[in-house]
Amino acid sequence: MDAWVRFSAQSQARERLCRAAQYACSLLGHALQRHGASPELQKQIRQLEGHLSLGRKLLRLGNSTDALESAKRAVHLSDVVLRFCITVSHLNRALYFACDNVLWAGKSGLAPRVDQEKWAQRSFRYYLFSLIMNLSRDAYEIRLLMEQETSAYSRRMKVSGVGVSGGVETVGPGGPGTPGGSLPQLALKFRLRILLLARVLRGHPPLLLDVLRNACDLFIPLDKLGLWRCGPGIVGLCGLISSILSILTLICPWLRLKP
């Protein structure tokens, strides 16, 4: 099992390079179509995109095993929320890869009777559930870091002798209960929360990259399942950005969100 996981990790970089090239072809094909390129050139780009997609499916054979191993490790996490989000995400990834393997068998001719449309819809559903769990985990970690940042700021203010009881609720000429002061206070609180969020993400690049990557990936299953039609241009752009961020985490392992 460990030997297979190591082999899968080695092929991961090639799969992500193919993924970046595939979505670059999708984006290029959309641009060529909008600018009235020749049908022959558009056909060649679509064929290249299809070959890259099939090649990625070949490289992902057996990734279900890797996802199940990751789920087994996540079960032992001490934080209940992280344990749930990460475990469920990996289990959905395992099911997604299993459906992807069936699709590869159908497209390669090994199982010509496979209903590819049905299995593609299943795979994108599992992919969507996995991304939802990933984003939930990101939101939870952001909340924890924002609470830590707020507590640290309060301690610094107490040490310096500045009172912070009430926080931003004490700001405003009309007080928290008066109509004249409520709207400016809400605007100030919202601005402070945005600044705090920006500070937290700036101080934790792995979390920032994970949020961006999952947010970009989310458009792909939403479009494929018909839940939110984005168009091939948006899907290609988001897929390309996500692929570049994934490659970046392979080149710089410290940018990978842990656990």
Swiss-Prot record:
UniProt keyword terms in alphabetical order: Acetylation, Membrane, Peroxisome, Peroxisome biogenesis, Transmembrane, Transmembrane helix
Keyword presence, Transmembrane: yes
Region (Interaction with PEX19, PEX11G and FIS1 and peroxisome targeting): 211-259
Topology class, membrane: Single-pass membrane protein
Modified residues (N6-acetyllysine): K43
GO cellular component terms attached to this protein's record: mitochondrion; nucleoplasm; peroxisomal membrane; peroxisome; protein-containing complex
Disruption of the gene: reported phenotype: Mice have a marked decrease in peroxisome abundance. They share several phenotypes with Zellweger syndrome mouse models, including neuronal migration defects, hypotonia, a developmental delay, and neonatal lethality but no detectable defect in peroxisomal protein import and only mild defects in peroxisomal metabolic function.
Sequence intervals crossing the membrane: 234-254
Domain of life: Eukaryota
Paired cysteines (S-S): none
One of the record's GO molecular function terms: protein homodimerization activity
Subcellular locations according to the entry: Peroxisome membrane
Major site of localization recorded for this protein: membrane
InterPro entries: PEX11
One of the GO BP terms on file: peroxisome fission
Assembly and binders: Homodimer. Heterodimer with PEX11G. Interacts with PEX19. Interacts with FIS1.
Function: Involved in peroxisomal proliferation. May regulate peroxisome division by recruiting the dynamin-related GTPase DNM1L to the peroxisomal membrane. Promotes membrane protrusion and elongation on the peroxisomal surface.
Protein family per UniProt: Belongs to the peroxin-11 family.
Protein name according to UniProt: Peroxisomal membrane protein 11B
Protein's organism: Mus musculus (Mouse)
